[in-house]
Design a protein with these regions (language model features):
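A structural motif corresponding to the C-terminal end of an alpha-helix
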Residues: 91-96, 163-174
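Conserved phosphate-donor/acceptor-positioning beta-strand/loop module used by diverse small-molecule
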Residues: 104-108, 122-142, 157, 176
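PAPS-dependent sulfotransferases, especially Golgi type II membrane carbohydrate sulfotransferases
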Residues: 194, 198-311
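Lumenal/extracellular "mature" regions of secretory-pathway glycan-modifying transferases
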Residues: 144-156
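Short catalytic/ligand-binding loop motif for oxyanion handling, primarily in non-cytosolic enzymes
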Residues: 11-17, 109-112, 136-141, 182-186
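Glycine-rich phosphate-binding loop used to anchor ATP phosphates in small-molecule kinases
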Residues: 78-116, 120
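PAPS-dependent sulfotransferase catalytic core
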Residues: 1-84
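The conserved 3'-phosphoadenosine-5'-phosphosulfate
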Residues: 32-39, 130-135, 140, 169-239
Length: 311
């Protein structure tokens, strides 16, 4: 079985993945190492990062793309989709032989359909953990790590959470809130374990305790959720995920409402901005800047003897 850890960057996915690997899960080889943004390691395979980024860029996207362009019907031609799935399956064939392999790479969230299909074709069962984090904490962490605006960070948070929920409908899944993991990791491991055919172990307790240091949570927010975009999208999604993280029923109607609203607005604004940039970069705008367009209009007015509509 492959247990995919899904969700936005800076939402506790690294901590969840490492804890799972210390409780009986097996990690792929070739991890992305620690850095100043993640001093205890990312616990995501370099090969998966390269593979996902190549797919995203081939289709005009990347990990920080807030759009849902890859959900559009013509995003993947059948031949392209088959090629992507084959490449993912080839990577999965290199995984260590183990009852439970844990894979975390945030871009997988946006490409879950391809990864899940490849995993099943390769003979793996699929289960998922969806990381949940208070949006202000995640947004501040994303903004600080990548030097982006809170608006883009919030859109990324929304997109990845919405896609994680959409793609895992009908798949074994557990919502795990980052704060809950830090508060009582044994409880959260047990919640995950009961959904899996092979029970997780807490035999490496000291290693987990040493890893889950209090300073791991560098962004803390205890106030109300700040909504952006003139909507309740952020707060509504967080409330639904937060409830699911304590085993309450998933609020599917609310999540579907937000998903469809985000999708419609994002698509329309994307088309509008594409047209804007297209016009701004058009030959007409390049050839006729105001210093030239003004005299040209005066010549046309003279040609019409400044009469009628040219008066």
């Amino acid at each position: 079985m492959i247990l995919f850890v899904l969700g936005p960057q800076r939402s506790g996915t690294s901590a969840i993945t490492r804890v799972l690997s210390l409780c009986g899960g097996t990690l792929p080889a070739g991890m992305l190492g620690a850095d100043t943004n993640n001093p205890l390691g990312y616990w995501e395979p370099r090969a998966a990062i390269t593979l996902n980024e190549s797919i995203l860029r081939r289709h005009g996207s990347n990990w920080y793309d807030p759009s849902l362009r890859l959900l559009e019907g013509d995003a993947f031609r059948p031949v392209e989709k088959a090629d992507h799935i084959a490449r993912i399956a080839a990577y999965l064939a290199t995984l260590p032989v183990a009852p439970l392999v844990v894979i975390k790479e945030p871009r997988i969230t946006t490409l879950s359909g391809l990864w899940f299909e490849a995993a099943r074709l390769a003979g793996f069962d699929v289960a998922t953990v969806i990381a949940v984090r208070q949006p202000q904490e995640a947004v501040k962490s994303i903004a600080k790590s990548w030097h982006v605006s809170p608006a883009l960070a919030s859109a990324i948070w929304l997109k990845y959470n919405l896609l994680a929920e959409q793609y895992t409908r009908g798949v074994t899944r557990v919502f795990v809130e980052y704060a809950n993991l830090l508060d009582d990791w044994r409880r959260e491991v047990k919640r995950i374990s009961v959904t899996l055919p092979n029970e997780l172990s807490t035999g490496e307790e000291q290693a987990v305790e040493d890893f889950l240091r209090p300073d791991l949570r560098r962004q803390r927010h205890t106030g109300p959720v700040a909504d952006l975009f003139g909507t309740d999208w952020v707060s509504a999604v967080y409330e639904a995920f937060r409830a699911a993280a304590v085993d309450e029923p998933v609020d599917a109607p609310t999540l579907e409402r937000v998903f469809e609203s985000y999708r419609a607005c994002e698509r329309d604004f994307r088309m509008a901005f594409q047209d804007f940039h297209g016009l701004s970069n058009s030959m007409l705008f390049r050839v006729f800047p105001p210093v030239i367009a003004g005299p040209v209009m005066e010549i046309l007015a003279m040609a019409h003897r400044r009469r009628g509509t040219w008066a």
